[in-house]
UniProtKB/Swiss-Prot annotation:
It is an enzyme of class 2 (transferase). It catalyses: [protein]-L-isoaspartate + S-adenosyl-L-methionine = [protein]-L-isoaspartate alpha-methyl ester + S-adenosyl-L-homocysteine. One of its GO terms (biological process) is protein repair. SUPFAM superfamilies: S-adenosyl-L-methionine-dependent methyltransferases. InterPro entries: PCMT, SAM-dependent_MTases_sf. This is Protein-L-isoaspartate O-methyltransferase 1. CDD domains: AdoMet_MTases. Gene3D superfamilies: Vaccinia Virus protein VP39 (3.40.50.150). Its EC number is 2.1.1.77. It comes from Cupriavidus necator (strain ATCC 17699 / DSM 428 / KCTC 22496 / NCIMB 10442 / H16 / Stanier 337) (Ralstonia eutropha). Keywords: Cytoplasm, Methyltransferase, S-adenosyl-L-methionine, Transferase. The keyword Disulfide bond does not apply. Belongs to the methyltransferase superfamily. L-isoaspartyl/D-aspartyl protein methyltransferase family. The gene is pcm1. The lineage of its organism: Bacteria, Pseudomonadati, Pseudomonadota, Betaproteobacteria, Burkholderiales.
Length: 259
């Protein structure tokens, strides 16, 4: 959950371009059916958000190494109702490309960062994904449009309980959630094809490396609060060798727990 990821480059979004219609339709069929009239009314705002994500991704390519976000990820970002995952007072800002407070000192991440982290995981339709830091449930909802199953852990009990209820209400049935210390992962369902951590750790947790499948990818912010943090891509090769690569500087809330 970002508290203000690397300031978005000051770019003017390019002229609207249609998202791949067939791909968007396919993603829509895969997502829950509880789309309301309000969701439909906000579709233009989601489309604007997606265009801004694309513009920021292009402007940040020199740092991130990603010149464009996978169209599958962009299609899902254009379908998931972000306004359902923020407090009422923040709903007017739901489709702005910035983090928003969700209570308990936590935030919902900037849409560009959600898209980038999801893109870096390279999630495939049959994959099982672990998320550390459920927050309001938005990242988990995005992942359900791409993966077979999503497991998500939140250490702050009220946030975790409300996020789980919200995901159930919105019919995201591929998600299993629990309250716990995400540092230790969720061994019962391991190994995972991809892992995403939405809070900054001082180091990459060894339990998460163990639970990552050979050939899998983990995206995690690492660094101390109020100091430099970097978004890391952790890859485990088929022979178990682990490599890491810095993607870009970010600013996340800290990963808390008894570790």
């Amino acid at each position: 959950m970002t508290v203000g990821s690397l300031p978005a480059p000051l770019v003017k979004p390019s002229a609207p371009r249609p998202l791949l219609p067939i791909l968007v339709a396919a993603i829509a069929l895969a997502l829950p059916c509880s789309i309301t009239a309000a969701d439909d009314a906000l579709a233009p705002q989601r489309a604007d958000m997606v265009r801004e994500i694309a513009a920021v991704a292009a402007a940040a390519a020199a740092q991130s190494g990603r010149h464009a976000i996978d169209p599958r990820v962009m299609a899902v970002m254009g379908q998931v109702p972000r306004h359902e995952f923020v407090p009422d007072a923040q709903k007017p800002h739901a489709y702005e490309n910035r983090p928003l407070p969700i209570g308990h000192g936590q935030t919902i991440s900037q849409p560009y960062i959600v898209a980038l982290m999801t893109d870096l995981m390279m999630v495939k339709p049959g994959d099982t994904v672990l998320e550390i830091g459920t927050g309001s449930g938005y990242q988990a909802a995005v992942l359900t449009g791409l993966a077979r199953a999503v497991y998500t852990i939140e250490i702050i009990e009220p946030l975790g309980r409300h996020a789980c209820d919200r995901l159930k209400r919105l019919a995201y049935r591929q998600v299993a959630c629990k309250v716990g210390d995400g540092y230790y992962g969720w061994d019962e369902h391991a190994p995972y094809d991809a892992i995403v951590v939405t809070a900054a750790a001082s180091h990459v947790p060894p339990p998460l490396i163990r639970q990552l499948k050979p050939g899998g990818r983990m995206v995690i912010p690492v660094g101390a609060q109020f100091l430099t943090q970097y978004l890391l891509l952790v890859e485990k090769s088929e022979d178990g060798t682990v490599s890491t690569r810095q993607i870009l500087p970010v600013r996340f809330v800290p990963l808390v727990g008894k570790h």
